[in-house]
C-alpha cells in the first residue's frame, strides 16, 4: 500500500483559499493591488450600507431619512434629551397589542421629528426645528429644564401634528384625557392668529378696529412703478440679431433703423407699426401721360416687288405671255432703259451670267461667220 500511494508533493506548499477581497496572489505585481469584480461589488455594497450622517449635516436639497420608532436617533445638541424621551414614550405605546398600526408608527415618527416631514414636502430646510419651534434657524433651542423632565408629573409627552391626529392616530380611550403638547407650547393658538370675538372686544362691546386695507394702485401709480431690471446682455444680443444680415434679409432691411437703436423705452407696438409703415411706402400717384395718336392706315400700299429683289431682273413675263425686258415695267412711253441695264448686255443664246471681257465677242464672231 505504501508503494501505491503517491508521496505528497512538498515542492508547492498548499496555500489557503484567499478571500474574494484579497488581491490575486498568482503573480506578484508592483504597484496598486488589483481587486476582483466581486470584491469591488462588496465594497460598493458596504459603502451603500453605511449609516447616513445626522440630519444636521444634510445639504439644502437632501431629504432627511425617517428613523424607526423603537431605535431612535442619538440626541443631537440642538434637540436636547426631548427626542430620546419622546421615542421611549412612543415605544411604550407601540408595545401595546393591536393598539398602534404601522401608519400610526410613521405618524408618531413624524411627530418626534416634525421637521423631517416638512423637509420632505418643501424640499430642504432645517429638519430639527418643528412647526411650533420659535427659535430662529441659526440658533438651537434651549435644553429642557429639570422641571420639564419625563419624571416630573407636570411634564406631558409630545403631541403629533394636528393634521395627522384625525387621519391615522388610534382612538383615545374614553377615560384618558387628551395628550397635551410639549412643554413651552400652549394648546391655544397665538393671539395674533385667533380673532377677537365681538362679545369680548374691549371698549363696551365695540369690535376691534381692523387694519385698513391697502389702497388699490391707480393707473398713474401703476405707471410710475419702477420697471423690472432689464437684462443688458439679452438686449445687446437682440440688437445684434436684428442688425445681422439674415434678419435684415428676412425683414426687408426695415428694422435696422435709428428707431431701433434709440433704446427700449419706446413702446414696442409703436415701433412695430412704424416699421410696417416704413416697409410698405405709399405708391406714387400715377402721372398723366399723353396718349399716343392712333396710327392712320396708308391710303396706298408701299409694297414694291422690284424693291425686294437684290438686283433688278433682266426678263419678266409680259401681258401676252412672252418674255420681255424688265426695264419695260418702269419705262414711260418710248424712253429707253438706262445704259447700265442688263437689257443691253443680254443677247439671245448668250449666257445668263456676264462673261469676262476677253471672251465677250466670241459668240458675235460666230454669228457673223
UniProtKB/Swiss-Prot annotation:
Please give the InterPro entries that the UniProt record associates with this protein. Answer: ElonginBC-PRC2_ViralRestrict, EPOP
Which keywords does UniProt give here?
Chromatin regulator, Chromosome, Methylation, Nucleus, Phosphoprotein
The residue ranges flagged as biased composition, category Basic and acidic residues, are: 228-237
Tissues expressing this chain = Highly expressed in embryonic stem cells (ESCs) during embryogenesis and in the adult brain.
Give residue spans, biased composition: Pro residues: 1-10, 171-194, 282-296
Ranges for the region named BC-box are 39-48
| Residues modified as Phosphoserine | 15, 19
Question: GO terms for CC?
Answer: chromosome; nucleus
Matching Pfam families, A to Z?
EPOP
- Describe what happens upon changing residue 40 to A: Abolishes interaction with the elongin BC complex
GO process annotations (BP): neuron fate commitment; regulation of transcription by RNA polymerase II; stem cell differentiation; transcription elongation-coupled chromatin remodeling
A GO molecular function term, named singly, is: chromatin binding
Decide whether keyword Zinc is in the record. no
Region Disordered, annotated ranges: 1-33, 89-237, 256-299
Annotated region (Interaction with SUZ12), positions in chain:
301-349
Record note on domains: The BC-box, which mediates binding to the elongin BC complex.
Please give the function described in this protein's UniProt entry: Scaffold protein that serves as a bridging partner between the PRC2/EZH2 complex and the elongin BC complex: required to fine-tune the transcriptional status of Polycomb group (PcG) target genes in embryonic stem cells (ESCs). Plays a key role in genomic regions that display both active and repressive chromatin properties in pluripotent stem cells by sustaining low level expression at PcG target genes: acts by recruiting the elongin BC complex, thereby restricting excessive activity of the PRC2/EZH2 complex. Interaction with USP7 promotes deubiquitination of H2B at promoter sites.
* Family annotation (PANTHER family): ELONGIN BC AND POLYCOMB REPRESSIVE COMPLEX 2-ASSOCIATED PROTEIN, FLJ44216 PROTEIN-RELATED
Q: What is this protein called?
A: Elongin BC and Polycomb repressive complex 2-associated protein
